[in-house]
């Protein structure tokens, strides 16, 4: 008989907090929740506050709130004025000096929402890592979520950091994002950027893979049953697979001549395509922040300038980009007092 004599170790504060954070509850908190919940709450709350009450008159010369007559598609939390540079515009900083109304007027809510939103997304990614570790599964969900994080950080933070000020970032609103897309096209020819092309291929390719995969699984479900839909035929305790990979493989082998024969490779490919698209788009946006150019077909531009009868879709788009720049520069930066005489506005062969 062995008798073990020991002393109970006192549990430290860290262990007590760790137990409380990881307690089984309806909404898991965890250590990641200490970052996620406050930042996400403040970002969403700041956005609702801005779109409801705060004007963009002092930063953009625009109405941007429900209070001023905007609707869900036209309301926005707009970026600070160009004169603010890259200031964080803290409420207690030299710009607002603790005046909340003044802080809202000069665009403080935008930096508030952008920074808290970025940390909220990072917190959600860490939440997926934390729960995956506790449950005992691989962290591919968190790895996949790095794609949206890279897009948010590159578009809302890195791009304006490479430009003159936060003013050139997108404002947080539907129509505001559309304006930003037109800006990227006019000033950077974004649609002809190879990183944008890879991003489009990744996102649309991921959507296509998702649709094909869902349809194929529905087509090859076991035990359909007599119900109007196939969902009730599934039971969590059934011993066999939900669908037939062999049948799906045979179907697509007949369609294309090739098919995925391995579920792991199939699902990794479905993960890889859209996430790679998001990352390549983010890399492209960082390139735009540094004013890297897209494809230039100068020979076509020179020939179009010399020959009135020669024009391509590329040269037409270049002229449209010039029109966007001429219009947006004066509209977006009224403090610069840009004046464009009629003779310098773009007039192409077909415009």
Swiss-Prot record:
Family annotation (SUPFAM superfamilies): Bacterial photosystem II reaction centre, L and M subunits
Keywords on record: Chlorophyll, Chloroplast, Chromophore, Electron transport, Iron, Magnesium, Membrane, Metal-binding, Oxidoreductase, Photosynthesis, Photosystem II, Plastid, Thylakoid, Transmembrane, Transmembrane helix, Transport
Catalytic activity: 2 a plastoquinone + 4 hnu + 2 H2O = 2 a plastoquinol + O2
Main function: Photosystem II (PSII) is a light-driven water:plastoquinone oxidoreductase that uses light energy to abstract electrons from H(2)O, generating O(2) and a proton gradient subsequently used for ATP formation. It consists of a core antenna complex that captures photons, and an electron transfer chain that converts photonic excitation into a charge separation. The D1/D2 (PsbA/PsbD) reaction center heterodimer binds P680, the primary electron donor of PSII as well as several subsequent electron acceptors. D2 is needed for assembly of a stable PSII complex.
Chain residues that bind a plastoquinone: 213, 260
Positions that bind Fe cation: 213, 267
Binding residues for chlorophyll a ChlzD2: 116
Gene Ontology cellular component list: chloroplast thylakoid membrane; photosystem II
BP terms from Gene Ontology: photosynthetic electron transport in photosystem II
Binding site residues for pheophytin a: 128, 141
EC numbers for this chain: 1.10.3.9
Superkingdom per UniProt: Eukaryota
Predominant place of localization: plastid
Transmembrane spans: 39-59, 123-139, 151-164, 206-226, 277-293
Bilayer topology term: Multi-pass membrane protein
Cofactor note: The D1/D2 heterodimer binds P680, chlorophylls that are the primary electron donor of PSII, and subsequent electron acceptors. It shares a non-heme iron and each subunit binds pheophytin, quinone, additional chlorophylls, carotenoids and lipids. There is also a Cl(-1) ion associated with D1 and D2, which is required for oxygen evolution. The PSII complex binds additional chlorophylls, carotenoids and specific lipids.
GO MF annotation, one: electron transporter, transferring electrons within the cyclic electron transport pathway of photosynthesis activity
Protein name stated in the entry: Photosystem II D2 protein
Assembly information from the UniProt record: PSII is composed of 1 copy each of membrane proteins PsbA, PsbB, PsbC, PsbD, PsbE, PsbF, PsbH, PsbI, PsbJ, PsbK, PsbL, PsbM, PsbT, PsbX, PsbY, PsbZ, Psb30/Ycf12, at least 3 peripheral proteins of the oxygen-evolving complex and a large number of cofactors. It forms dimeric complexes.
Recorded name of the encoding gene: psbD1
Note: 2 of the reaction center chlorophylls (ChlD1 and ChlD2) are entirely coordinated by water.
KW DNA-binding (keyword) present: no
Enzyme superclass (EC): oxidoreductase
Subcellular location: Plastid, Chloroplast thylakoid membrane
HAMAP family per the UniProt record, alphabetical: PSII_PsbD_D2 (MF_01383)
């Amino acid at each position: 008989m062995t008798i073990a004599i020991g002393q109970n170790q006192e549990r430290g504060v860290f262990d007590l907090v760790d137990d409380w954070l990881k307690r089984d509850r309806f909404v898991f908190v965890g250590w990641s929740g200490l970052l996620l919940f406050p930042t996400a709450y403040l970002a969403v709350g700041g956005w609702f506050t801005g779109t409801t009450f705060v004007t963009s008159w002092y930063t953009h010369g625009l109405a941007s709130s429900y209070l001023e007559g905007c609707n869900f598609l036209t309301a926005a939390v707009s970026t600070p004025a160009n004169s603010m540079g890259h200031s964080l515009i803290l409420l207690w900083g030299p710009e607002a000096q603790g005046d909340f109304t003044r802080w809202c007027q000069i665009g403080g809510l935008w930096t508030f929402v952008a920074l808290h939103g970025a940390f909220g997304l990072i917190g959600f990614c860490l939440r997926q890592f934390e729960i995956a570790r506790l449950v005992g599964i691989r962290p591919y969900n968190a790895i996949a979520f790095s794609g949206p994080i890279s897009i948010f950080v590159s578009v809302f933070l890195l791009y304006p950091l490479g430009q003159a000020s936060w003013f050139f970032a997108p404002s947080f609103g539907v129509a505001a994002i559309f304006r930003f897309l037109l800006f990227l096209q006019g000033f950077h020819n974004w649609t002809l950027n190879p990183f944008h092309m890879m991003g489009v291929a990744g996102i649309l390719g991921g959507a296509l893979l998702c649709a094909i995969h869902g349809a194929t699984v529905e087509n090859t479900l076991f035990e359909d049953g007599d119900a109007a839909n196939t969902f009730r035929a599934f039971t969590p305790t059934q011993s066999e697979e939900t669908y037939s990979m062999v049948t799906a493989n045979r179907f697509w082998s007949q369609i294309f001549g090739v098919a995925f024969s391995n579920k792991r490779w199939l699902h990794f490919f479905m993960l890889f395509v859209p996430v790679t698209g998001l990352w390549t788009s983010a890399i492209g946006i960082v390139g735009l922040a540094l004013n890297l150019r897209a494809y230039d077909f100068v020979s076509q531009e020179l020939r179009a300038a010399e020959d009135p009868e020669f024009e391509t879709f590329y040269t037409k788009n270049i002229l449209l980009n010039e029109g966007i720049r001429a219009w947006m520069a004066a509209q977006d930066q009224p403090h610069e007092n840009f004046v464009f005489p009629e003779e310098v506005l773009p007039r192409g062969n077909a415009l």
